[in-house]
Amino acid sequence: MKQHPAILAIDAGNTSIKAALFRNSSIVSTSTVCDAEELRAWLKDLPAPSGAAACSVRPSVNESLAAVVSDFGITLQFLGSDLPADVPLEVEEPDKVGADRLANAIAAYHRARGPAIVVDFGTAIAFDVISPTGAFIGGAIAPGLQTSLAALHEKTALLPLIEVAPPPDAVGRNTVDAMLVGVVHGAAGVVDRIVDNIREQLKFDFTVFFSGGHSRIVAPICRTHAQMAPTLTLEGVHLAWSRHNRPDAS
């Protein structure tokens, strides 16, 4: 039986590069790497991709990522430039909507088949709001967990630089735990309030998705019911590639 071709999807964020190899609509393998050379090493033992697409909010790595993909004799298509997103942008500055938010909108609407809110926990906590017709209509941006912890360290004399971790309790009994309680519980409160406000203002029956590296730390504390979607951005990149590179695509 003939196998579907392998397609590589890349999400180049501010602090890391995530990648997934797809066959048809299924993910074969995923990885989080620091740079293009680590991506090349990860791909070495996987089926060679016959197509590749990326969303990038870090232009400095685009050339090196494209070079890795060119090893397979294919061209890396970047969402929003080489690769159309086909997402209506009902915002005041459509040219400033990040490629990762376009990818989230594509995948969330594909999954929900209706209005959706994506909460993406990365360097920033980004809220992407998708209308009942699949348009990106805006959202909100708040500091991410590691960003908040780093700011506490940088803007104070004595608070240490620590890594994100689940807080042990609602009350921190030492400095590190107190920082984790404040940042993680604070983020959960921000998520609940913003999602509630969006629902109250727009009156849509939203499906909510949690994505991004720190979603599993915040989700247990949130009141907001959400579907966990750790690969949502990569799914959106793959969907965009598939729509424009299938044999019958114009």
How would you label these PLM feature ranges?
Residues 1-12, 26-116, 133-250:
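Nucleotide/phosphate-binding catalytic cleft detector across ATP-hydrolyzing
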Residues 83, 124-125:
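Acidic, glycine-rich active-site loops and adjacent beta-strand->loop/helix elements
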Residues 17-21, 118, 125-130:
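Short beta-strand scaffold segments in enzyme catalytic cores
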